[in-house]
């Protein structure tokens, strides 16, 4: 679990104080049950210079369980990277399940695509390259996607999380879930003002804090914030 490189502050994929305890969780409950395609993609992604952007293995396991528990069928993912969380979702969905996946970088997505294809899951995925906001705006304008998504996972540009939420709340069904990743930003949300954070970490931290405050005040949703991975907040639409 490397912590060197540009993403040191936000790349550490556990908020536990003990690395040994996190390793115990991985080795006892996560890695032994990790499907072979996910293991293969995790190992491929580990060689990527930006590997710390990937979804952690324990969070992938959590997403898989969650999707099965809510019987999700129509899903969306904003922010794909090499596709580890996308693969977890595709494996958890029924054969006729669908994922609308959006990312500004097709090259990263294509790193994981051969693994997805080999697993026989590519038919579940519609990938769109480019910014997600124009796509969401068009979907809302079309009118036929209102309340049509069972589950939406967002792991993208933190400075647009609130902009995503304003749109996704219309696209997720009542009773459906939106999951926002990195909502604890490697613990920096409680860092003192004089903490030695890198410029981009401090910049995005303010947007994460703003999001957390807005979600807590949004009466249209029930929320649950969990210290899984880098923090994930689940929002269940109730109105």
Swiss-Prot record:
Q: Describe the effect of residue 58 to A.
A: Decrease of activity
Membrane spanning stretches: none
Q: Which SUPFAM superfamilies match?
A: S-adenosyl-L-methionine-dependent methyltransferases
**Class of the enzyme per the UniProt entry, highest EC level:** transferase
Q: What is this protein called?
A: Caffeoyl-CoA O-methyltransferase 1
Quote the annotated effect of residue 202 to T. Answer: No effect on activity
* Database matches in InterPro entries: Cation-dep_OMT, SAM-dependent_MTases_sf, SAM_O-MeTrfase
Additional free-text comment from the UniProt record:
CoA moiety is essential to enzymatic activity since free caffeic acid is not a substrate for the enzyme. The N-terminal amino acid sequence of the protein seems to have a particular role in the enzyme-caffeoyl-CoA interaction.
Q: Which gene encodes it?
A: CCOAOMT1
